Structure formats: structure tokens, C-alpha cells
């Protein structure tokens, strides 16, 4: 996921299927890999 980018995670994830999820994970500073697994 593009969420890995800490610059503008919300904006990048905005075009994805799980924008809110990516946003929350970024706030928690948790890599998407953990949740995806």
C-alpha cells in the first residue's frame, strides 16, 4: 500500500480501497504489512 509514505498518507490512501484504515494505521505508526497479514 502507498500508506507506507509518511508524507501525505491520507491523501495517498484516499485513492485506495481502505483510506480510513490506512489513515488510522499511519497515526498508530503501524506498517500496513502487519494488518494485511
UniProtKB/Swiss-Prot annotation:
Domain of life according to the entry: Eukaryota
Claim: Protease is one of the keywords in the record: no
One cellular component term from this protein's GO annotations in UniProt: extracellular region
Keywords, alphabetical: Blood coagulation cascade inhibiting toxin, Disulfide bond, Hemostasis impairing toxin, Secreted, Toxin
Molecular function per GO: toxin activity
Signal peptide (UniProt feature, chain positions): none
Modified how: May contain several disulfide bonds.
Tissue specificity note: Expressed by the venom gland.
Localization per record: Secreted
Summary of subunit composition and partner proteins: Heterotetramer composed of 2 hemextin A and 2 hemextin B chains; non-covalently linked. Does not exist as a complex in the crude venom.
Family: Belongs to the three-finger toxin family. Short-chain subfamily. Type IB cytotoxin sub-subfamily.
Its job: Hemextin B (monomer): does not show anticoagulant activity. Seems only to synergitically enhance hemextin A activity. Hemextin AB complex: specifically inhibits the activation of FX (F10) by the TF-FVIIa complex (extrinsic tenase complex (ETC)) (IC(50)= 100 nM, Ki=50 nM) by non-competitively inhibiting the enzymatic activity of FVIIa.
Protein name: Hemextin B
